[in-house]
Every structure is written in C-alpha cells, then in structure tokens.
Regions:
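C-terminal non-catalytic regions of proteins with extracellular/luminal or membrane-system context
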Residues: 1-21, 31, 66, 72, ...
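Short beta-strand segments of immunoglobulin-like
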Residues: 37-44, 408-413
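Acidic/polar residues at beta-strand termini and the immediately following turn/coil
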Residues: 45, 83-85, 115, 484-485
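A short beta-turn/strand-edge loop motif at beta-sheet boundaries
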Residues: 45, 57-63, 99-102, 427-433
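Contiguous beta-strand segments within globular domains
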Residues: 45-54, 415-421
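Surface-exposed coil/turn segments at beta-strand junctions on protein surfaces, enriched
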Residues: 46-48, 84-88, 99-103, 413-415, ...
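Short, surface-exposed alpha-helix to beta-strand junction/turn motifs within ectodomains of secreted
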Residues: 47-83, 111, 124, 128
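A generic structural motif
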Residues: 53, 88-96, 473
Length: 561
C-alpha cells in the first residue's frame, strides 16, 4: 500500500476532527540523547522536538495547543514538512529536562490544536519509555579512550579572564539555561552518530567530584531560558559565586542556518539571562555547544568561554575534564568568529531566511536559488586579515591554562621548499599542548592575494612546564602558489614571501625569502569558468568591489540550469 492509499483511508473531510497518528497500545521508545528527533532536517521548527507525530489533516500553526508529560506542561509546536511527496503536519514535542532518566515511563498528552477547517483535535494520550542505560564494555575501552581524547582536544578555550578556569574539584556547578537539557553530541541527518551510549554534560557533572546544583537544573527542565526566581538565585550564590550558562544550537543537513535570533544571534532570553548572571555572580562561564560560529557581541561580559562543538559520545565527560583541570584545553578555531553576521562579505549573497523570507531546504520543490560568490578569495580569515576588520575570535585561536613561547629558526628556501625549525616551550606552570601555525604573505603582483594564508601546522605532545619540542617544517612550492586564471596555472610570483609563525592567524613575522622570477608549479585544464563575469572583491578597490548581492537569490521561473 502506497502513501496515497494510506492517506485515503484516514478520515480527513471538512467536518472530521484531526487526530494524531500513532499505535495507541504501543509504548514509544525514546532515546533521551536524541535531542532533535528524526524529522528536524525536514523543518527547522522541529529542532529540539524529541517525539514527532503526524496529524491526520492540515493544521493551523497560529493556534497554540498543549502538551504534558506526567501532567507537567512541556513545549510543543506544529510544523509542516514534505515527506513521501506529501505535505504532512506534525506535532513536535520538546521533552527537554522533563524526561532525562534512563528506563523511565511517562504519560504524554497532546490537545488543543485546530485544523485549517476550524475543528479542534481529538485529544491524544500515549506512553513513552526512555531507553535503558547501556553500560560500558571492557572490550570497548580502547575505542572510548579515542572518542574521549578527540572530544577533549577539540574543546577551544576562547576566554579565561583572571584564571576563572579551571575550577576547584569540589566546586558547586550552578548551571543556567535550557541548553543543559538540549545538549548535543552530533549534527542531524548524515552528521548524526549512533554510538553505544552517550554521556551528557549534566550526567558527567553528576558523576564527578563537582556538586551539581540539581534544584537549578530542575528549574530549567521547563525548556525555556527563563530568569530564575530570587530565592533560587540566593541559594545558588550561597553554594558558589560562579555561574555557568550552557548555550546549544542544532545544525545539520536539509536547511541552512540563518542570522535569526536563536541561530547566529542570541535570543532575547539568552541575552537577558547572561546579563542577569553578570549582575548577580562574581564569575560567569559560558559553554557553547554549537556546531557553527555564532555572533559574539553578547558574550563580551563573560569571564570564561568554552567552545565545545559537537564532541561525540563522551562530549559531556570531556567538558567536565576541562572544567576541573584534568585536561588542559588545546583546541583551535577552524574558522573566524565574526562579531556580527553583516561583517561577513558573503552575507550579501548567501540566502538568509529572515524578515519574512521562507526557509529553503533540499526538498522545497523546484526552486532555483542562485548564489554569486562576489567575495572571491576573501573567505573567512583571508578577508578579515586582509582588510583589517575586527573579529570576535580569530582563525586558529585557542587559549590554554599555561603559556607557550614559539621561536622559528633557520628560515631558508631552496627553490623547491621553504625550510625552518620551530621551538615550542611551555613557559607556564601546568602541562599542556600547543599548535604551531605557519602563515605566508605572498608578494603583490598580477594575481590577487590575501595577506595571510595558512600553509602548515603541527601540534605538540603534552609538554610539562619548561619542556620544549622542536619541529622541522618543509613547505613545498605547491603549498605556496596562487592560481592564475589567464594561464590556468598555479604560480609563485616573483617578490618577497613573508613567513609568520605563531599560535593563530595573528602570528608574528619570523622571516622571509625572495623569488627573483615567476615560477609556474602546475598547469591545469580550465573548467567551470563562470558564464558571466563576476566582479570580485579586491584590495585595489574595496568600496567599488564589495559584494552587493544584487545577482543572488531566488530566480523566478527558473528551475534548472
């Protein structure tokens, strides 16, 4: 039986009351760590919905319904997405912290929603059961060590004023924000992982030497970034003068993120909560559990900031290990964090579903969405460094609980490669790791070039205080070329090549070498040339070439190339 035949058997006439489709006598199994559920990739409105059930009829999205878990109200949304070539209306239920215990049964009710014919739904009631806890196995220990190490080394310490971190091991953790109950381990869609088990931040904290303020965490089980009552704040301050705010963002295939509040920008509630914490606590620590950069202006008052990304199955344990100092953070940013979305030149051309513009996903029908890359080569740090624009956090950036010195020696060029050594010394008081980053500034010539390009990097082993590690670098010509569109060749133009060595894109100059004649390294066959000429951003005329976005967007009447 196909989907059309199934739908034909469901009462959906004008006077028929809508209802949710589910097996009434079957207990639904629910994974407490599947924060975004199975259908978030079909409609962004379903992000954070743990259980998603289809309605029998098209529903109104402007009339709020009610969902409860064991009598306690939880957020619920109605959203439509196209699946199996059908428009399906869903009820997406956000359990948040209302269901976070293993092996727990709960009664869920949904009521009050109205269909497009004006009929109120038949109230629904069903039972969910959270999955049982999966225990670690001896034979998996080696694999889990790899998973934990990857999560730990990927955490980036973005800010640490006056040694706010690490915390003492007997600290009480006052965790604010709904993000603690929406902790994400992976992306959605093809980026989703299915490990044997997961360890969230709250679970790891509960099983650590830290004391978790459980009353505060229970307050945020409501699924909202609400300001806590005065009594709860007073109790929290008695336990610790530090506050932790956990912010989580979903990401994955199906739809691009936007600059909306709650995606790139902070929500009004997040902004208000962070300001409230700064006013009421001596130290504020922000944990960013996001899969992409977000606007940084609202973070400026935080004393410490950890960017965790999506750390996989043991992400929560990795964060606890960094907070208590068992692990010294050593991650580096793989992208530039702009203060504002509008600071990014590609924002002029990239489709941004704001100000009433609809989201456009992979299954939104026959729509031609054109994106003209007017920014040219100036993507990420290549733009911000070249044009001297202020950023929130630069490319390659990441702090440590210790300090390092990096010294480059013996820079030379033999016609085929750039050679030198770099000495990295731990000049601080605790063991840690550092990443040596090599950037090149190529000479100005016929070909447009940014003022910095990453050409190599290496990470140290764990260095004890006063310990040193030396690296030998050989950067081949193929990593130092620029592409000449006229000759379809990768070329090293003559002139001075400046070498920068350090711990981020803000590395200091370490030396230079001169090329007396142009050198063609490789010639290729030209493909994918633009049909129409694109005026690209150039240092020679920033104002006249800065992207406008005039040629990008939805093209009416066009559905194919």
């Amino acid at each position: 039986m196909n989907t059309d035949e199934i739908y034909a058997k469901i009462p959906h006439g004008k006077d028929d009351k809508p209802f949710l489709l589910f097996e009434p006598n079957k207990v639904m199994e629910y994974d407490i760590y599947d924060v975004d559920g199975p259908f978030a990739m079909t409609n962004k409105e379903l992000v954070g919905c743990n259980v998603v059930l289809p309605f029998s009829k098209p529903m109104r999205t402007d009339i709020a319904g009610i969902a409860t878990v064991n009598g306690k109200s939880v957020p619920v949304v109605v959203a439509m997405s196209q699946i199996w070539n059908m428009d399906i209306w869903w009820a997406g239920i956000k359990f948040g912290g209302a269901l976070r215990e293993y092996g727990q049964k709960a009664t869920v009710t949904v009521s009050g929603f109205v269909d497009t014919d004006g009929n109120e739904m038949i109230p629904a009631q069903f039972t969910v059961h959270t999955a049982e806890k999966v225990k670690a196995k001896k034979e998996d220990i080696v694999h889990e060590k790899v998973a934990l190490n990857a999560a730990e080394e990927g955490i980036v310490l973005l800010k640490n004023e006056n040694g706010t971190l690490p915390l003492s091991v007997d600290e009480t953790l006052n965790v604010f924000g709904k993000g603690q109950h929406e902790f994400r381990f992976c992306a959605i869609g093809a980026g989703k992982t299915n490990p044997r088990y997961n360890v969230s931040f709250l679970e790891a904290a509960e099983h650590s030497r830290f004391m978790l303020n459980s009353e505060l965490s229970e307050f945020y089980a409501c699924g909202e970034d609400t300001l806590p009552p005065e009594e709860l704040v007073t109790k929290a301050k008695e336990k610790s003068d530090k506050a932790i705010m956990l912010i989580s963002r979903s990401m994955g295939e199906g739809f691009d993120a936007t600059s909306r509040k709650g995606e790139f920008y902070a929500t009004d509630e997040e902004d208000a909560l962070l300001k409230f914490l700064r006013k009421n606590f001596a130290k504020v620590i922000v944990i960013l559990n996001t899969g992409y950069p977000i606007g940084t202006e609202f973070l400026e008052g935080a004393d410490a900031i950890l960017y965790t990304g999506f750390g996989g199955m043991l992400a929560g344990q990795a964060i606890v290990n960094v907070l208590n100092g068992t692990v010294n953070p050593s991650g580096k940013l793989p992208d530039t964090w702009a203060k504002r979305y509008e600071d990014i030149p590609s924002s002029k051309n990239f489709y941004n579903a704001v100000e009433g513009k609809p989201r456009i996903g992979t299954d939104c029908g026959e729509i031609w969405l054109d994106t003209v890359y007017e920014e040219g080569i100036y993507v990420g740090y290549r733009y911000f460094q070249t044009f001297g624009k202020e950023v929130g956090f630069p490319f390659g950036f990441g702090l440590s609980y210790t300090n390092f010195s990096i010294r480059a020696k013996g820079i030379s060029y033999d016609g085929k490669s750039l050679h030198f050594t770099a000495e990295v010394a731990n000049t601080g008081k605790v063991a840690g790791k550092e990443t040596v980053q090599i950037y090149l500034k190529k000479p100005n010539g016929k070909i447009e070039k940014p003022v910095r390009e990453l050409v190599d990097f290496e990470k140290t082993r764990l260095l004890s205080p006063k310990e040193m590690q030396t690296f030998s670098f050989s950067v081949p010509n193929s990593s130092m070329t620029s592409y000449d569109e006229e000759t379809s060749s990768y070329v090293m133009e003559k002139g001075i090549y400046e070498v920068f060595v350090g711990s981020s894109v803000a590395a200091e100059k370490a030396g230079e070498f001169r090329l007396t004649a142009d050198k063609t390294v490789q010639t290729v066959k030209p493909v994918m040339r633009p049909i129409e000429e694109i005026k690209e951003l150039s240092q020679k005329d920033e104002k006249g070439t800065y992207p406008t976005g005039a040629r990008s967007g939805v093209k009416e009447g066009i559905t194919y190339l």
